Swiss-Prot record:
It catalyses: 4-CDP-2-C-methyl-D-erythritol + ATP = 4-CDP-2-C-methyl-D-erythritol 2-phosphate + ADP + H(+). It comes from Aliivibrio fischeri (strain ATCC 700601 / ES114). This is 4-diphosphocytidyl-2-C-methyl-D-erythritol kinase. Its EC number is 2.7.1.148. Keywords: ATP-binding, Isoprene biosynthesis, Kinase, Nucleotide-binding, Transferase. Disulfide bonds: none annotated.
Amino acid sequence: MITKTTRWPSPAKLNLFLYINGQQENGYHELQTLFQFIDLCDHLTITANQSGQITLAPDIPGVKTEDNLIWKAATLLQQHSQCEFGAHIEIEKILPMGGGIGGGSSNAATVLVALNFLWQLNLSNDTLAALGVKLGADVPIFVHGFAAFAEGIGEKLQPATPKELWYVLIKPEVSIATVDVFTHPNLVRNTPKQPLNALLEATYVNDCEKIVRSVYPEVDYQLSWLLEYAPSRLTGTGACVFAEFNSEKEAQDVYSLIPDNATGFIARGMNTSPLNRTLEEYKSLCKI
């Protein structure tokens, strides 16, 4: 066990496009989507210990410890590996909840990767991803740490290298439950599947966007505002919307115009997760 206190990034992601191709008998939807990380991150400061207990600080308002994906991920890893070690995890939270940028899934993946290292379990990324999918369909993306084209219910991953653009994100003052979007009767569920090359060359679309804009006026308003300046879309099932730019200056210029009552961020697209780089740095320092 490595007892040194370590600090780990937990990055957000964007769905650059999202197509819904059908629905399985079990209710899960068949998707085609392109994930890319952005340099907007929560951070987790983790100290492994011999207590056998998982403790978190500070509490997240409205979330019980046993419902927190960070705690769930650590406990799941303990149980799977029969590890008797514990950990104290401090959370620096900046990613908005219910935003469609993967904050909870990313937190879970960061815990799996970090504790696998600190507890010296030596589990493969495939094993960690298999554990992670029990916590959320997006967790494997964050475990593997590369931008990816995903199919199936999101579990079939193929590395991809979309342009690393600059983005302006706006988080409307609403939280959207994924299940509410995917169960909406008017959701498009029959977009034909296409090869990745064709999708990459086409105009990017999110099949959830029309429904979300119709049900949540706040999302429609903010997305309409962004569309005045640049190509813009919903990410995931929302609520975050984003506009894309070729340069940081272009993004900064539009960001400076965001209405005072809106919560916004500037971020850079990344095809390799900062979590990967942090892990390699700690391995080098500890000569593992």
